[in-house]
């Protein structure tokens, strides 16, 4: 006898949703679909984050949803839609302009504002990225390890990863116009 849900109870690392799509490949109610990403399509693998550590909170509540279900299987969505905000699947697919952008600094919470449910935060799920290594500053917290698509690892703050535009320049795992305004 095997349980129906064979997922690990929780994991400490997460992928970049612009490369790792969620396990939802077609939903009639959404404007866009997830697509599998071949590593050969990445424009700048040495400058594109593949994975990072989750923010460790009390009883891992930072990676739980409001119903207290652990969502550590979800990748981090680094971008927001120009018109849809964090609801990236409902961003229109048409037009020649970039439809996604990096969140503003104001969407990255200071350490004192971090709490439960960061994995489902309405501003950006980037707030669920770890900040528990040395470095960083008193306001935003410490650093995290980031694995890049070419295999190297770098330690930096979540804010630095956003300011340096290291999560990519396309929402590779999203159908339609997936350009990011960098």
Locations of the language-model features?
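Short, well-structured segments within or immediately adjacent to enzyme catalytic domains
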Residues: 1-182
């Amino acid at each position: 006898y095997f349980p129906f849900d064979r997922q690990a109870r929780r994991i400490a690392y997460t992928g970049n949703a612009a490369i790792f799509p969620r396990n939802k490949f077609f939903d009639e109610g959404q404007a866009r679909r997830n697509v599998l990403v071949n590593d050969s399509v990445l424009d700048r693998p040495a400058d594109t984050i593949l994975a990072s550590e989750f923010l460790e909170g009390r009883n891992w509540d930072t990676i739980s949803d409001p119903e207290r279900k652990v969502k550590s299987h979800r990748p981090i969505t680094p971008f927001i839609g120009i018109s849809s905000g964090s609801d990236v699947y409902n961003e229109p697919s048409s037009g020649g302009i970039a439809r996604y952008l990096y969140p503003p600094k104001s969407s990255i919470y200071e350490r004192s504002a971090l709490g439960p449910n960061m994995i489902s935060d309405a501003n950006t799920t980037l707030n669920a990225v770890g900040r528990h290594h040395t470095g960083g500053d008193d306001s935003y917290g410490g650093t995290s390890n980031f694995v890049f698509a070419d295999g190297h690892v770098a330690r930096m703050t979540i804010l630095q990863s956003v300011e340096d535009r290291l999560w990519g320049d396309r929402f590779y795992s999203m159908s339609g116009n997936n350009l990011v305004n960098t």
